[in-house]
């Protein structure tokens, strides 16, 4: 179904088809078609970590797949918590391919000397990449869809992980991504705080930054805590603004982007610029999906961001076919350059990421 039909045709008919497609795709990996909403005496668990706000009966599975009461009761899949999280972690040499590396302390000289010991990119150091399993969205074009496949062996203890990270003094930052961190925000907050507390006790001069990359659908109180950690440590937060129109977000990602836009606006209005002009606290990012996230969509997103603050960094990413959209081509060069030019009309700091993929077009 094309972009024009999604935005302009009979929405009730379009929506029915969209939900059917997502239902079939999610069934392939054992996930519910929509967020469960148990009622009355059937309620066994309520979760408010993200926009989906699942209400589970004993037979339900949360939309993210991380909370399965039946499997929890037999010990097959314990619930994630503040002290345990489903995560795949590894060290990544700085500067990394992180979406914000073009302006962060690890990839530039920004942040020196308050948040980095290097007056240049931090070569010879590492970022701890914390890949979270589970997601509050269900993107048909997901570039990291392995997050849907996890088991008990992927459950890590927060203290053990914090000690491992602190022990390696070459690790200068922690980046949460996934999936998306929202379904496990309490764990991410606890881990970040423990690392920073341990470093402060052991060696007060060590610089250590914490960053989040997410779809922005999280609980307001929790994302506020994340922002404060990122702000104080010299890290930042990247929002995936996958689309501007809610209908398009529902079509591509299965979930509304209403809370994403609200959360972006809230954090930007309250925190962006508080560290000064040289250290952006947050950014926006958009994957240019051919035929869907075109220059018109990019213009709406760029305009939305600019109305909050023109200095907020915005990154446009080249798409390559993956997951259920493997048949789509790489973002055409003309589309990428046109979108870049349009975004630059609205914003002062625009970046084109994954440029190497243009060599395959």
Predicted region positions:
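Auxiliary Fe-S-binding modules of radical SAM enzymes
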Residues: 1-17, 26, 32-42, 47-58, ...
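Conserved Radical SAM active-site core
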Residues: 66-232
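Conserved AdoMet/S-adenosylmethionine-binding subsite of the radical SAM
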Residues: 155-330
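Generic domain-boundary/flexible-linker signal
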Residues: 13, 58-61, 75, 141, ...
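Structured core elements
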Residues: 46-49, 129, 175, 238
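Flexible, acidic/Gly-rich N-terminal and inter-domain linker regions that tether
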Residues: 1-125
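A general structural-boundary detector
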Residues: 37, 117, 122, 126, ...
């Amino acid at each position: 179904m094309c972009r024009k039909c999604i935005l302009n045709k009979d929405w009730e008919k379009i929506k029915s088809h969209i939900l059917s497609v997502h239902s079939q795709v999610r069934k392939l990996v054992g996930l519910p078609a929509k967020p469960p909403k148990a009622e009355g005496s059937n309620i066994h668990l309520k979760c408010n970590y993200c926009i989906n706000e699942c209400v589970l009966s004993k037979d339900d599975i949360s939309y993210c797949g991380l909370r399965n009461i039946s499997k929890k009761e037999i010990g097959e899949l314990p619930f994630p918590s503040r002290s345990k999280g489903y995560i795949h972690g590894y060290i990544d040499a700085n500067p990394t391919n992180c979406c914000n590396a073009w302006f962060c302390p690890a990839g530039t000289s920004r942040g020196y000397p308050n948040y980095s010991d290097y007056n240049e990119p931090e070569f010879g150091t590492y970022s701890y990449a914390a890949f979270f399993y589970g997601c509050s969205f269900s993107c048909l074009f997901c570039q990291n869809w392995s997050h849907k496949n996890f088991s008990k062996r992927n459950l890590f203890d927060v203290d053990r992980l914090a000690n491992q990270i602190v022990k390696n003094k070459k690790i200068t930052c922690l980046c949460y991504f996934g999936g998306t961190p929202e379904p496990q925000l309490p764990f991410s907050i606890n881990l970040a705080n423990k690392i920073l507390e341990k470093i402060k006790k052991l060696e007060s001069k060590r610089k250590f930054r914490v960053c989040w990359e997410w779809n922005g659908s999280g609980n307001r109180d929790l994302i506020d805590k994340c922002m404060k950690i990122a702000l104080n440590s010299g890290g930042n937060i990247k929002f995936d603004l996958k689309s501007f129109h809610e209908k398009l977000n529902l079509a591509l990602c299965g979930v509304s982007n209403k809370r994403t836009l609200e959360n972006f606006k809230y954090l930007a209005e309250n925190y962006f610029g508080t560290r000064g002009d040289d250290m952006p606290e947050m950014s926006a990012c958009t994957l240019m999906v051919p035929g869907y996230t075109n220059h018109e969509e990019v213009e709406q997103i760029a305009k939305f961001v600019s109305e909050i603050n023109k200095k907020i960094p915005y990154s446009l990413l080249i798409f390559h076919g993956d997951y259920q959209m493997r048949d789509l081509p790489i973002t055409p060069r003309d589309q990428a350059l046109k979108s870049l030019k349009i975004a630059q009309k609205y914003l002062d700091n625009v970046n084109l990421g994954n440029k190497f993929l243009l060599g395959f077009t």
